[in-house]
């Protein structure tokens, strides 16, 4: 069974834990030493000071979480170990690699407490094999990747140009802006693709 390290309290990230458990993997929080992959999950905004900016649109900041996740992300990067970032996790990973963020964008945050759904496009073989060149995903964020971190390349975009997924050119690092764990199993939706296919493919590839 593959073990996935999460820096935090597993009870706060039940959707992730349940989705990976359904795929035969375990999310653990005690030690990253023997884990097969690091998971950087969704959550509040990364403090702009970590990418050299003042606060202009960031909110809900938790600097202690930022520091802990940046430290473990940079450790896994230095050791060339697999990382999966989801939503905030994609943004934090970009910052860990020296990139910056758009502190506020319109049209991607929830409406009446529910995730938006929008189309995304790709020419990347990983995604086209799973879902085709255009498909629908959920959306629940108000920040996004701006200047790319070192070694990252975009592989999926929303129609407005927002970067929806990145992959590292040489390291086993992959991240998405949407929430696949909220598009599968008990949270499967008829208006998006099945997020389980993506999570299973990441477990296999990374």
Can you annotate each of these PLM segments?
Residues 174-178:
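Active-site-proximal beta-strand elements of phosphoester/diester hydrolases
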Residues 139:
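Short, basic/aromatic recognition patches
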């Amino acid at each position: 069974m593959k073990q996935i390290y999460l820096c935090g309290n597993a009870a706060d990230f039940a959707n992730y834990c349940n989705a990976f458990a359904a795929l035969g993997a375990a999310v653990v929080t005690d030690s990253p030493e023997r884990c097969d992959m690091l998971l950087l999950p969704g959550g509040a905004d990364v403090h702009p000071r970590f990418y050299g900016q003042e606060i202009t649109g960031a909110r809900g900041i938790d600097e202690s979480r930022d520091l802990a996740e940046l430290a473990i992300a940079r450790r896994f990067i230095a050791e060339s170990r697999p990382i999966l970032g989801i939503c905030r996790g994609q943004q934090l990973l970009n910052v860990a690699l020296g990139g910056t963020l758009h502190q506020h964008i319109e049209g991607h945050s929830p409406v009446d407490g529910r995730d938006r759904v929008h189309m995304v496009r790709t020419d990347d073989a990983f995604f086209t094999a799973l879902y085709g060149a255009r498909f629908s995903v959920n959306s629940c964020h108000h920040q996004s990747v701006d200047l790319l971190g070192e070694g990252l390349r975009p592989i999926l975009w929303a129609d407005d140009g927002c970067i929806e997924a990145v992959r590292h050119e040489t390291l086993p690092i992959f991240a998405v802006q949407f929430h696949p764990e909220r598009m599968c199993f008990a949270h499967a939706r008829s208006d998006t693709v099945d997020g389980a296919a993506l999570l299973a493919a990441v477990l296999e590839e990374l």
